[in-house]
Amino acid sequence: MALLIEDKKQIVAEVSEVASKAFAAVVADYQGLSVEQLTTLRVEARKLGVTTRIVRNTLAKRAFQGTQFDILNDNLVGPTILGFSTSEDDMGAAARLFEEFAKTNKAFELKAAAFDGKVYQGADVSVIANLPNQEKALTMLASVLQAPISKLGRLITALKEKNESEAA
């Protein structure tokens, strides 16, 4: 079905707005998936705060102009679904969602992802997918900071016990 110019402009504006607020974007080929499978993907995306769109490639290229995701334009070939991580707390959510979905749906193929001005092709999308969310990152930081303090505490206790045993 042919889209009217007004409809195309609206789609470009919507995608451009989401892209300008997103921290990461993922591009995947959905050819061969059923409507039911795509609906499942979209439901999971909503749960994670990920925005997904199926847009014509030329419209996506126009929408990406002036955003950090214009570096993905070379990957906009064939049937394409876009995923955007818009949550500051979980910047890798879209990549993680698409990667997990690709594991269970062989027809779903990751093309590329963009994060922080860099493009990750195919299997390298896992770099973004493995980014910890904010809670996990803070937990990792706390454990790294806690380890030296624990060692110091054990050292002081050992020295105290040694001094007590020598005094006795």
Curated annotation (Swiss-Prot):
The keyword Repeat does not apply. One of its GO terms (cellular component) is large ribosomal subunit. Transmembrane segments: none annotated. PROSITE patterns: RIBOSOMAL_L10. SUPFAM superfamilies: Ribosomal protein L10-like. CDD domains: Ribosomal_L10. Coiled coil: none annotated. Keywords: Ribonucleoprotein, Ribosomal protein, RNA-binding, rRNA-binding. GO terms for biological process: translation. Forms part of the ribosomal stalk, playing a central role in the interaction of the ribosome with GTP-bound translation factors. This is Large ribosomal subunit protein uL10. It comes from Acinetobacter baumannii (strain ATCC 17978 / DSM 105126 / CIP 53.77 / LMG 1025 / NCDC KC755 / 5377). The lineage of its organism: Bacteria, Pseudomonadati, Pseudomonadota, Gammaproteobacteria, Moraxellales. The gene is rplJ.
